[in-house]
Amino acid sequence: MSTANGSSPTRISILGEESIIVDYGLWLNYVTHDLLNNIPSSTYVLITDTNLHSLYVPQFETAFTSASAAATSNSSATPPPPRAPRLLTYAIPPGEGSKSRDTKAEIEDWLLEQQCTRDTVIIALGGGVIGDMIGYVAATFMRGVRFVQVPTTLLAMVDSSIGGKTAIDTPMGKNLVGAFWQPRRIYIDLAFLNTLPAREFINGMAEVIKTAAIWDAEEFSALEQNAPAILSAVRTPASAAADPNARLLPISDILKRIVLGSARVKAHIVSADEKEGGLRNLLNFGHSIGHAFEAILTPQVLHGEAVAVGMVKEAELARHLGILRPAAVARLVKCIASYDLPISLEDKRLVRMTGGKSCPVDIVLAKMAVDKKNEGKQKKIVLLSAIGKTHEPKASSVDDRAIRVVLSAAVRVQPGVRPGLKVDVTPPGSKSISNRALILAALGKGPCRIKNLLHSDDTEHMLNAIGKLRGASFSWEDDGEILVVEGRGGQLFAPSEGELYLGNAGTASRFLTTVAALCSPSSDGDATSTVLTGNARMKLRPIGALVDALRSNGINIEYMGKESSLPIRVDAAGGFGGGVIELAATVSSQYVSSLLMAAPYAKEPVTLRLVGGKPISQPYIDMTIAMMRSFGIDVQRSTTEADTYHIPQGIYTNPAEYTVESDASSATYPLAVAAITGTTCTIPNIGSASLQGDARFAVEVLRPMGCTVEQSASSTTVTGPPLGQLKGIPHVDMEPMTDAFLTASVLAAVASGTTQITGIANQRVKECNRIKAMKDQLAKFGVHCNELDDGIEVTGNSWTELTEPREIYCYDDHRVAMSFSVLSVISPHPVLILERECTGKTWPGWWDVLSGVFGVAMDGEEPLSHSTVTGSGPNNRSVFVIGMRGAGKSTAGKWMASTLGRTFMDLDTELERRHNTTIPDMVKSEVGWEGFRKFEVELLREMMETKPEGYIFSCGGGIVETPEAREALISYCRAGGAVLLVHRDTTHVLEYLNRDKSRPAWSEEIEKVYIRRKPWYQECSNFEYHSPHLGVEESAVEMPVDFARFVSLICGKSSHLREVKAKPHSFFVSLTVPNITAHTATIPKAVVGSDAVELRVDLLQDHSPEFVVRQVALLRSLCKMPIIFTVRTVSQGGRFPDADHAGALALYRVALRMGVEYVDVEMTMPEDVIETVTKAKGYTSIIASHHDPKGTLSWRNGAWMQYYNKALHYGDVIKLVGWCRTDEDNFSLLTFKTRMLAAHESTPIIALNMGEQGKLSRVLNGFMTPVTHAALPAAAAPGQLTAAEIRQALSLLSKIPKRKFYLFGKPISKSRSPILHNTLFQQTGLPHTYSRLETDKVAEVETTIRASDFGGASVTIPLKLDIMPMLDEITDAAKTIGAVNTIIPVPVQAGKQRLRGDNTDWCGMVHSLRMAGVTGKRACPASGVVVGSGGTTRAAIFALHSLGFSPIYIIARNATSVETIASSFPAEYDIRNLQGTLAYTEGMARPEVVISTIPATGDVDEGILMAVDSVLTLPMGTSNTGAARVLLEMAYTPTFTNMMARAKDAGWGTVPGFEVLAAQGWFQFQLWTDIKPVYSTASSIVMNGTSDSS
């Protein structure tokens, strides 16, 4: 039988049967006939997943029906054949979540319902999940029925479908319950791969690489060579091909080869060892560790991705054990990476997909302990001995200690080296020479076989980058020991896709910057530039001098982030101009080498002139010139000009072979181990003839320190002095070997005397500030160092007196790590060195050498902390405020500076100070507008460079008029800085500008100016504050709460998400209003009891960004709580058009600019939209959501997993909303949520069901439940409840325990506190009660406050002082006031609680005064007055001080009491006893607030009344005009007192005592419940005196 192309398929024998059938087009043209003719049955059951069902099942049903009918009609049998066989189909949700006991049972029950019998044939159509699980169903159903595999993924084709392993997953791990059950057929139809997503295809390549790595070196080489072609085809979008099914046509032969190759190997091994007795273990290479990773990270990480990382770790383990050569490890890693598979758990994609979930080593080892290959407790791992070969023909026994070292992020080095040890160590190839050799060979013509190339992160980045630029092709020989580079003579092209990511490879970044300038645009014209970028540290390292030199030679280079650092965009100009190039070479010699190596390809011969002082690291420049000569270009050093070089034009001629000398910097570490331990070490291939300056280390550093040094032209041997007898060097200039200073420093730490090292200033701008790093980390050993301008001074200690460091931090710097490993071998104590793997930059196998060659014992360890370094971090970056003049920039800037504790600077004011003139006069002078703008830009750039942290700068309104200023601001945003646009309504701006004479007059209409500047303001800023607060009289305005919240968010100081995660129940109210403006009275009531408010943008009447900005600003000012910004599409249950992705993205950008706390992003949005939002989110939290309003997804199976996984990838919070039809749906949801939280506890989940029957899920959700409110026009979703309703339900379920609250004191019978709190409890749905406990004896309340159901208490006279000793803690406010009026139980552990005493009397006073117009900020100083000296007086003083009033006068009869009170407060309160009347004096702070604390009934002392009258009648000063003057009466009855009447007659405002009662109770309620009612509600309850409803 033939396939679609007319050819016969390829058959592979397994277990004596040719049951594996491979070709294109089998599914519709071959499978049905083969089944009917060779595996007959009355019932065929096709089981697949819901993703594949619609794609492949209908067509197969048609083909099956036709073939079955034809077979029946063509039969001539007598009697006639039975009726045609039936074909049943069943679909399950896709993903690893379906590979479970529940799904298996569901399928089995369905098979029984369909009356399937033992002759049934099951067809498993799908990937590994389907094949594994359906195979297990077949193995157990009716005690075993026949089944066939139809793998649709590459991984299933080459691995899981072959061999008869079937299984399901359990909580303990993958595939732990299953059976060996061989399929009767395995139909491998390669056409399925055309529709396989790229990630799934790449996932399968891990198994292909694995098979070649253990079995076939030739096939492995083919995989290396074919990686670019395979990836290119796989990543071609289906839409880009004329026929989507032809996407992989260019690699069809390659595909068939790799599938056949892998399938044949597996079939051979299975045939020899079906039940995994030994040989079949080899197929588990990478799986022992990989399966453990997968068990922890499933289902977010795919099997092949976990195995890829597992292969790397198991290869590193083989290297650590001395079995596998480092070059083979490097080759395997490069091959895996070339297929875009992860090679580390730190891979950014894995981190994002798993929500940053870690794989603790202890858990990984525990997962590995249940591996089926193990024998008892002995772990068995497949160890490679070479590419294509294993150490044993089975898995090998490996101790946990060795595994732990390889898995751990840190290593604890145990001191001790065997006395008399003599070793030979060959370090890896020189990093400097390796990188130069790669550049030269790629730019050269013809093949070049490079030997001893360094296999490290740096060279990997270089190789990958050259490959992307199509500068050369690469292949490996001699098991990865030789790299063959086929250079293309300088023909390079800008990369068509992606940027050049260089990690922290500084050498590569400098060299490739100039190489990128040689690139031409890509052949398709799509790529006209090259972007070079790196990790966070790389983005701080300098490259400015090199960029300046290239720019001066005609190359356009753009900084995409921080000025003078990566990332940069280099135009593909096809080469730079040449001629004379001047370069500052005092920072890095790599700048010089970069230009030297690329110079032959310039458009004219180059003369390179080094300026600015003596070039740094001259030996490295000499090395570059010597190597260029080896490749056929002879550089001439000028004989007439200092530091000048002449480079001819030409093309490098590649030598047939080039051997990279071992790295002399790396060689210093084994030599230093010998030196510090008194042993002997020989480096056989570095001597006096070396090109490298560091080769002088042994002679110029170690010999003076007391070592015996023997050095020939090609080798170096060092023998250290007896232990503890190293001698310090008074001074050594290490400028020729700067990288080696770290090694010298650790030796100096245990040498006698003081060693001074100079000439190493460039080491401050390497991977870290190495000089400071050595000083700080040596201090942990008790070694004292001094930093010098260009070096370090180390005072040695005896090695026996070294202190034990808690840990050594390595700054992600390989040389720091290796240097401290040297010191660790003689430390009196074991030393924990963090960031073990950073040595991979130059010597990936260093720890293996230290362990295997020097015999140093070490243990892998997971540190408790990841860093001991502290810094200001990005949160302290200076902020630039821009906007129109009069928009409130200075006010907002001062607010920011105040709340963040930073320095405010107005750049216009600073410019006037520097030029000693006003801006209007400057513009009128010969300087003019042009000169002013020039000064303005210069000042802006200076502030960005010299004050990058700790400042808030207010810029002039016209700063954006200058292109250079706009470029600087845009660059600042890109580099992670904050530029804030402040805006308010234009009418307010006009009002201000019409009377502002401090700036030049407008020469055109203001609105025209704003319209012109508006797009510039937008592009120059990344945050925007639209203010309803910034009035004309800005100096008198206090910072609004919403602005403080905004600033907290954009500067990374918001803690809201952390706070709500800690709460047992939290809510957000969903607004369903078309315009916030029309509901300003409703919204404050609707948000009560919620922790956030959701703005349903899709429900607004206008979706324009301008309208939405105003809506967000108004909502933020109204409700003063975090905002959830939601654009819900139609298909997700909202009203925003599904197809308007651009509109949705524009709105998301509005949200991020406005610094909202949460943005809801639907997971059905296109990937590019989601990626754009998540990359730009800053400190905004993403709620990754998916809604199923049609109820098509079930919580019982794995249907929700694909959405959960995607949400976990992108979200800080996950929101999944289904539909409920039965109560069971709610319980299934709860089970799903519990399981997901157990797997990823750091990522909270909102999971609930819509519909009436889904209300229970809302009650039980717990975290951030969406709610409605009676005041809103409609609920946002079917079944949505109010927060109060949910609390009522929770109390019925005992999820909110009923608490008892009290009022303590005497007399209290007339107190209105019970009605206040009981009403508020009822309104918010809380089950609590508040009652009076009248007593004047504090002992009578002790049992009550320690009861388990005690919820809190109000305390009044006479117990406010007596209660304090009975409490566990007192707030600072209550301590200062000296009285407690509120008791708050604070949970601590397991039902226990501490009692905290607080005082809300002063809070009530402050709130009442603010409501009356009093602010804490005023135009000029003002004083306050307290009448009386009783218990309330102290709270009144505290309240006035908190509002900034000073001095504070006390009017009272008893002078002694006043003195006592005054002396008990800090002097800064400035409390004065007012005797008699208060007379006006020049410059005095006039009183603006009087608080009366004396009884309102009975006679008041005449002296007090006279003093009060003198205060009330004191004339208001001109500067105080407009300030509120208020008397606050603390007495409750009568409602209008004599004191209030006097104040009113004097023109003062008054506040009755009941307001304070209501306010202090309002604050108490918030402290007890964390719910903030509308104040007017509390006030109304108290004022109206409604009867107690309880």
Curated annotation (Swiss-Prot):
Q: Which InterPro entries would you find in this protein's record?
A: 3-dehydroquinate_DH_AS, Aldolase_TIM, Aminoacid_DH-like_N_sf, DHQ_synth_AroB, DHQS/DOIS_N, DHQS_C, DHquinase_I, Enolpyruvate_Tfrase_dom
Enumerate the residues binding Zn(2+). Answer: 207, 287, 303
Instruction: Give the pathway listed in the UniProt entry for this protein.
Output: Metabolic intermediate biosynthesis; chorismate biosynthesis; chorismate from D-erythrose 4-phosphate and phosphoenolpyruvate: step 2/7; Metabolic intermediate biosynthesis; chorismate biosynthesis; chorismate from D-erythrose 4-phosphate and phosphoenolpyruvate: step 3/7; Metabolic intermediate biosynthesis; chorismate biosynthesis; chorismate from D-erythrose 4-phosphate and phosphoenolpyruvate: step 4/7; Metabolic intermediate biosynthesis; chorismate biosynthesis; chorismate from D-erythrose 4-phosphate and phosphoenolpyruvate: step 5/7
Principal place of residence: cytoplasm
E.C. designation(s): 4.2.3.4, 2.5.1.19, 2.7.1.71, 4.2.1.10
Instruction: Describe, as the record does, how this protein assembles with itself and its partners.
Output: Homodimer.
Q: Name one GO biological process term.
A: chorismate biosynthetic process
* Cofactor binding annotation: Binds 2 Zn(2+) ions per subunit.
Protein name in the entry: Pentafunctional AROM polypeptide
For this protein's source organism, the top of the classification is:
Eukaryota, Fungi, Dikarya, Ascomycota, Pezizomycotina
What are its GO cellular component terms?
A: cytoplasm
- Family (UniProt): In the N-terminal section; belongs to the sugar phosphate cyclases superfamily. Dehydroquinate synthase family. In the 2nd section; belongs to the EPSP synthase family.
The UniProt record gives the binding positions of NAD(+) as 49-51, 96-99, 127-129, 132, 152-153, 174, 192-195, 203
Looking up CDD domains in the UniProt record yields: DHQase_I, DHQS, EPSP_synthase, NAD_bind_Shikimate_DH, SK
